[in-house]
């Protein structure tokens, strides 16, 4: 039976957990290699989702002549909150 494809958030959460385990440094070599391989797979899943999102954004921001209108995005709401906290 084929494994269900993870959504972006699931893959990212698992990737973060794998990285945390690997950074701990207490794993036997074989387990570390297995987790590293899993992490590579998870990073590829995340990358596919991000590339797909980038393509969708390019389509949505295309002008009437088919050219892409590049718009600079401001900081995310979370980034703005972090900036305000430093003041």
From Swiss-Prot:
**Gene Ontology molecular function:** exodeoxyribonuclease VII activity
Q: Which reaction is catalysed here?
A: Exonucleolytic cleavage in either 5'- to 3'- or 3'- to 5'-direction to yield nucleoside 5'-phosphates
Assigned GO CC terms = cytosol; exodeoxyribonuclease VII complex
Keywords assigned by UniProt, alphabetized:
Cytoplasm, Exonuclease, Hydrolase, Nuclease
Could you mention a single GO BP entry for this protein?
Answer: DNA catabolic process
EC number(s) reported in the record: 3.1.11.6
Top EC group: hydrolase
Q: Which cysteine pairs make disulfide bonds? A: none
State which residue ranges cross the membrane. Answer: none
Q: Where in the cell is it found?
A: Cytoplasm
Q: Sorted alphabetically, which Pfam families does this protein's record hold? A: Exonuc_VII_S (PF02609)
User: InterPro entries in the record, alphabetically?
Assistant: Exonuc_VII_S (IPR003761), Exonuc_VII_ssu_sf (IPR037004)
The family database entries (NCBIfam families) matched by this protein are listed as: xseB
The family classification in the record reads:
Belongs to the XseB family.
What does the record give as the function of this protein? Answer: Bidirectionally degrades single-stranded DNA into large acid-insoluble oligonucleotides, which are then degraded further into small acid-soluble oligonucleotides.
Read off the PANTHER family from this record: EXODEOXYRIBONUCLEASE 7 SMALL SUBUNIT
Complex and partners: Heterooligomer composed of large and small subunits.
Q: Which protein are we looking at?
A: Exodeoxyribonuclease 7 small subunit
